[in-house]
Amino acid sequence: MRSLLSLIPYFRKYKKKLLLGFVFILFSIGANSLYPLVIGAAIDDLTKGTQRYSLITYALTGIGLIIFSGTFLFLIRQNIIVVSREIENDLRHDFFSHLQYLSRSFYNTRSTGDIMAHATNDISNVRNFVGPGIMYSFQTFTRTVMTLFILFSLSPSVTLLALVPLPFMSYIVYKVGKLTFNRSRKVYEIFSDLTSKSQEIFSGIRVVKSYVREDHETNVFDKISFDYQKKNLNLAKVQSFSFPMMFLLTSLSIIIVIYYGGNKVMEGSLTIGNVSSFVIYLGQLTWPMIAFGWIINLVQRAAPSMQRLLNITNIKSDIADNEFTDSGIKESDIKGDIEFRNVSFKYPMSNNFVLKNINLKIRKGTTLGIIGQTGSGKSTLINLIPRIWDATEGSIFIDGYDIKKIPLNVLRNSVGIVPQESFLFSDTIEKNISYSAGTSSDINRDEVIANSKIAGLYKDVNNFPEKFDTVLGERGITLSGGQKQRTSIARAIYKKPEILILDDSLSAVDTNTEEEILQELKKIMNNRTSIIIAHRISTIKNANNIIVLSNSVIKEEGTHNELVSLGGIYCDIYKKQLLEEEIKDF
């Protein structure tokens, strides 16, 4: 319950609409509460032999009350339910926005399906509480107070007897609600698994097809889906029990009214019209009794859902601007001079250091080549520069500033990374390349074309029917591996970063294309600090400085010629690759 108090700021934002909705509830229920009295008066007049014009008056009055009540019921929903949708939108925006700023460590411990379930199911549960829950709570309270006041004014004794079954109705709904909550939680957990599995299969559909595992994955999915169906059926069994019980208890109340009310009519203390009004009022009280238990159920579902959302939104990113950030540092202050001082790093939940005591200087405008076996820490090293991760020990400086003091947006805007795995969005090629542009109106087509030429992509794009307006599939699935890498390169250089990092981003292209791209990149790399990670020495041999990472440390450092002369790890790799080339040529 306490978690729902966090919704108060959202309610304050829409307090005028909510208050107006509550006022409309009073008008609607007030008119609705008079309707049974009109029916009762009409029946009494009929027993006395009323005139035709009197019946018309009662009919018109009844119709007028229904129209009046219905109009305000419409206005209620236009205010309170609309507010619930607006709050739902605000919650979804805040949740999604918060997710964008969480650090990498958060995503390493959460599945995409689980996050998606929070963004759909949990927010939907909260919305049901904010809209129907609050609306029906006030309606139930108002209707109960007004109806009981009128019933007690007609006959306190009959009212008390008629109300005896109704609390049982609320109790049943409450108990059913409790069972519903427990089973709903199980449904939610399976739904999260179902979403995760779906997302995983569709993301890896190429692997599934290449290994001919379609039937296997379908069977695995069917098992989860069947479990989801079973849990939903268990939930439906509990919910279906409540409706027959509601009908039984409502019928019991009506029978009590007819029996005891009939005796009162014979005694002369009540009229037939009064008894008729009683029956209608009991019908009106039935919904509040049901709603009471249903509202408790909504609260029971919304409270844990809100808590799950809060568990995420209360997480503070471990990499963010803080009181030590120097807001005076601007992008114009970043020139690209980088220094690692005694930097060591290990991933969260791990005891093993991926990098140990790294000391490295990269001068502004120079190119650093990095080579080493798989798992030596190459990608980890470059991910420390834009603070995707923070160094466990030691410090990194850019132009004399500790990177922890540089505002994150300044730091990351100054760094352009082409990652190992090229991720492209389901959008046009132009928008993928110009991703760093603020809005569509900020996109410069000439720059998009120029950067695509540098990345060796322009000829390929021109062969597409829609050219740069070609819409890519999910993750750029319509492009080849090499085309995706080149699109990522074009995207990085479109940003015009002071520091350009290529993380093995030419591995999917042939050596001739690689050479062409590198020659084009030289034109823009002259004035930029560049870091190139590669497995092929041909990619980095012209770098100003090259380091060899092995077992988490820098084993060798120097130019291509110096490292070949050294006769160490670099030289061995170079000789093996030369031999491979000779074998290919042979």
Stretches found by the model and what they are:
Residues 99, 221, 309, 340-342:
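Conserved catalytic Walker-motif region of ABC-type ATPase nucleotide-binding domains
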Residues 18-72, 79, 153-157, 268-272:
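Transmembrane helix-loop-helix hairpins at lipid-water interfaces of multipass membrane proteins
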Residues 327-586:
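ABC-type nucleotide-binding domain
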Residues 104-105, 121-130, 134, 138, ...:
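An intracellular "coupling" helix at the cytosolic face of ABC transporter transmembrane type-1 domains
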Residues 48-54, 150-167, 173, 234, ...:
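Helix-loop-helix
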Residues 12, 23, 31, 35, ...:
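Hydrophobic alpha-helical transmembrane segments of ABC transporter permease domains
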Residues 2-3, 11, 43, 76, ...:
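Juxtamembrane loop-to-helix connectors within ABC transporter transmembrane domains
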